[in-house]
A protein has these predicted regions:
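Short, structured motif recognition centered on aromatic/hydrophobic residues
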Residues: 2-6, 18, 29-30, 50-54
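Short coil/turn motifs at helix boundaries and re-entrant loops, enriched in small/polar
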Residues: 13, 34, 41-46, 72
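Short coil/turn motifs at beta-sheet boundaries
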Residues: 1, 45-47, 87
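Basic/polar N-terminal segments that are highly enriched at the extreme N-terminus
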Residues: 1, 105-106
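Specificity-determining recognition surfaces
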Residues: 98-104
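An amphipathic, aromatic/His-enriched active-site/gating alpha helix that lines ligand/cofactor pockets
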Residues: 20-38, 55-95
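Short, surface-exposed ligand-recognition loops at beta-strand->loop->(often short) alpha-helix junctions
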Residues: 10-19
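Accessory recognition modules or surfaces
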Residues: 7-8, 43, 48-63
């Protein structure tokens, strides 16, 4: 099992709109495709920061879920263009992280 820690920088003044779109559209859509989202956050002091975490049981599951989400017409035609208006794609940081054996997330 592993997690993706995904950090996004909104375009200036767009963080609240980005967070709302993630919470109301992107996350529910991805969950409907089988994605497990374990948390989402905004930066307390970083005014443009939005962070979310997804969990995968295996690389095979991640590949299957990526295909289901990012290969869909809804993602390609609606969500991806909209999200591009809200965040700086060049500043996206995705870290794959593995919980330690004693972590409650293990």
């Amino acid at each position: 099992m592993f997690y993706e820690l995904r950090q996004y920088q909104s375009l200036p003044g767009k963080r609240d709109e980005l967070a709302r779109y993630m919470e109301e559209v992107i996350i529910p859509f991805q969950v409907s495709k089988g994605m497990v989202v374990t948390g989402s956050f905004t930066g307390e002091t970083e005014e443009n920061l939005y962070v979310w975490i997804r969990r995968f049981e295996s690389e095979a599951e991640r590949e299957q879920l990526y295909k289901a989400v990012y290969g869909s017409d809804e993602w390609k035609n609606e969500q991806s263009p909209k999200i591009g208006e809200l965040l700086d794609r060049e500043k996206i940081v995705v870290s794959r992280i593995v919980p330690m054996p004693k972590s409650v997330l293990h």
